[in-house]
């Protein structure tokens, strides 16, 4: 059975996911067979495994860092918020039910056995499993029925590293406060602290570290620097506030609409590696004059279309599109680009039909069953944003309940393969000029040749030189991350904690 180590945090967005990714890569570099695990994840950034199951995107990234194929066992319970107090519950990769936060509070303990069974399957296949917690273990209003932090640590006998974010301030109060709110038997599982996102001279922290260690009898095992220019997907939507949008010199400006229920916003991270500045905007005044407007995925298409209307963003997007600004919609954003959205089963809200932006001659109807599959195929259309790309290979994954019907709009992609075998269907739509494009393919910009051709089509339209292809190696990004974190933490002590476990 695999040995375990767990990363918990003092709050959300302290960097648990990226630290787990780093540890996964470090253990892989050291020759171990390693896998990530998070029993319960609340996220709208989702990934589809080869089996067609949904998991949190963070666990897919961590699996990639491990050099293994993502599986539903890595995230057996996924909560996808549909409103402020209602979520769709994904269990073992498939939709289980949609319930309120209060109902889930009662339901969650019933899923503990499911979560532990998935962990045990991972332990049987690997040398090490790196577990990620969620939020904070000291959320005292939730801890009696939680199945993601101390409950998992205790059930699995997993030693815990507690991470805190020093960049936001108050890290020592957060660490001491978290320990103080834990029960004595829970504190026993905390074997070390990781101070994350530090900028400056680490030696200046010594007096505070001495106090922290004296008061809690738990050692600080690392001070990790604030990571810059890392082309690795981030999970928490708080990241959108911090996103600076580019890696290197840029010649294109891309504005991504920050929908209230935005999902899979990491679809566009790769664009920042190819000379584009990617910024998230939520007000009309922030749009400016971009070369491309992107309407991203959303868990609730109809409510977010209503938001676009009420905020004035819809009018602005339509005006700019009519003046020639390129517009791309992905998944829910693709549905929004059409003329009408129908929800006869009230899947998303009480609204059964709503006008879209009308930039594509399409209509979308929500069905009861969700489509979740990996896909591969080729570009079919050859104009505008897809100019010169006909026949270019693409791959990615689909997660949607809507079915989109095309009228005068032109199909954009031809899907030829899924994990089940050969396929033959069309995806996406473009207007005749190719200036407005929609697709259901998540992860499409991970395809380097397509990404470069897509951006160069915009450059040609703009009248600026095309860029030659640079090979972007995400594997090197994981090694870069691992090297930085390895140099910042006491791996000898972490290995000792890993080997000793909980006794």
Swiss-Prot record:
One annotated GO biological process: cobalamin biosynthetic process
Pathway: Cofactor biosynthesis; adenosylcobalamin biosynthesis
GO terms for MF: ABC-type vitamin B12 transporter activity; catalytic activity
Keywords: Cobalamin biosynthesis, Glutamine amidotransferase
Active site positions, chain numbering: 331, 442
Domain GATase cobBQ-type: 251-450
Entries under SUPFAM superfamilies matching the protein: Class I glutamine amidotransferase-like (SSF52317), P-loop containing nucleoside triphosphate hydrolases (SSF52540)
Family statement drawn from the similarity comment of this UniProt entry: Belongs to the CobB/CobQ family. CobQ subfamily.
Biological role: Catalyzes amidations at positions B, D, E, and G on adenosylcobyrinic A,C-diamide. NH(2) groups are provided by glutamine, and one molecule of ATP is hydrogenolyzed for each amidation.
Name assigned to this protein: Cobyric acid synthase
Annotated organism of origin: Dehalococcoides mccartyi (strain CBDB1)
